[in-house]
Amino acid sequence: MASPARVKRSLPDLTHPELTSSGAPLVMVTAYDYPGARHAEAAGVDLILVGDSLGNVVLGYDSTAPVTLADMIHHGKAVRRGAPNTFLVVDLPFGTYHAGVTDAMRHAVRVIQETGADAVKMEGSTPEVLDVVRVLSRNGVPVMGHVGLMPQTAAAQGGLRVQGKDDDSARRTLEGAVALQEAGAFAVVLEAIPARLARLISERLSVATIGIGAGVHCDGQVLVYHDLLGLYEGEEKKIAKRYADLGREAREAIAHYAAEVRAREFPSKDNSFVMKDEVLDKLY
């Protein structure tokens, strides 16, 4: 018997009061392609984020800065095809919402129209970003905010380092999250900040907080697909947890395949097709 179709989370489902009453934090994971999206939806996550982290983990860049709007749309389309019934958020990449509200609106609408996403995400809480959040939200484009460590502008923050550990940084992070809520953001990502600060922010906001490296008291958590599955071997990141070791398994599987090819063990008879002798004889 076929299982019933999954019911996609709606925007009202993602509000803070409903989360606290249910007691179950939201689960978000990144995905960048069709198979990854299928895995995430089949696992029953609440939200999928097509993050501009694809620049690092998929495209091989050193940062997210080179990622373009075309990149995000291309990958967003693939993810939506793989996860038609999961709430989908797509990052607006660096430079697409910094030149004014008109440009930002045009880019956000393109993302929604061309990918089928349910919302967009943007980093920061400067007055310019808040203006964009305000206009998009008022015009029917749901926006997820992002404070704390912001990879798009990490160089200006002193690199990829924990934020909110001193008085000024903690206050900026708290005030930025509150300002994003007031501008209309339906949720705010808290990245790489002390757990106690994240708890305070979560208590202050009436919209959901989604943590990554921000402790257990956020209203939800997000991890990068490649970090979660251990697709890259090496030291485990502090803000992530490795639930599998697929990088090692992939390397070993490819090495096994290569060894069998070189030993003429693959393809075997089980992987080959046959033909009748009389058909072959006519070719000589």
Swiss-Prot record:
Superkingdom to which the source organism belongs: Bacteria
Molecular function terms from GO: 3-methyl-2-oxobutanoate hydroxymethyltransferase activity; magnesium ion binding
Binding site for 3-methyl-2-oxobutanoate: D52, S53, D91, K121
UniProt keyword list: Cytoplasm, Magnesium, Metal-binding, Pantothenate biosynthesis, Transferase
InterPro entries to which the protein is assigned, alphabetical: Pantoate_hydroxy_MeTrfase (IPR003700), Pyrv/PenolPyrv_kinase-like_dom (IPR015813), Pyrv_kinase-like_dom_sf (IPR040442)
Residues the record marks as active site: E191
Necessary cofactors: Mg(2+)
EC number, as in UniProt: 2.1.2.11
Subcellular location per the Swiss-Prot or TrEMBL entry: Cytoplasm
Cofactor binding annotation: Binds 1 Mg(2+) ion per subunit.
Subunit structure of this chain's protein: Homodecamer; pentamer of dimers.
Protein name: 3-methyl-2-oxobutanoate hydroxymethyltransferase
